Amino acid sequence: MSHDDWPTSELARAWTHRGIDCRVYVADYLDNGYKRPNGYAELPEAHPARHLNLQGDDCGVFDVHGGITFGGDGSRVIGWDTAHYDDNWSGDPNKPGRLWTVDDVEDETTRLADQIADLYTPESIAMFKAATRLRELADELDPTKETHA
């Protein structure tokens, strides 16, 4: 799987919210029979967050349970998972931790889609394009960079 594709696990739900494609995938990550749901959303081509390192330096851009744990840094698909310390990993409702349902993950992923859409404005796109061009110009003018003429 390349870093910018949708996951290859079992698709549980797909929808579009405010123009953002969203999906919930499930997989038995621990081979214990419990298929844990995780949420994913697609960043539009010109979205300013598409080129950020969402799992590193720019991890605070989106507020989602556990942070962005899939994609980022040029990826078209970003996602989050339900495998954190305060989550129920067993699938047993009698065990401690939050046991996420597909409906719960859909709600949290829809909240992520709202954040993506809120950042996808004409102003933010124009600023991103201007910043990209400034970086390109700086690279062209940098005397320490080798040119291939």
Q: What does each model-identified segment do?
A:
Residues 1-2, 139-149:
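Short intrinsically disordered terminal tails
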Residues 2, 8-23, 50-126:
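Polybasic, proline/glycine-rich intrinsically disordered low-complexity segments
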Residues 25-27, 42-44, 81-83:
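Structured loops at beta-to-helix junctions and adjacent beta-edge loops in soluble globular domains
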Residues 33-48:
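Acidic (Asp/Glu-rich) sequence patches and key acidic residues
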Residues 113, 117-120, 135, 142-145:
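Generic secondary-structure transition motif, activating predominantly at the C-termini of alpha-helices
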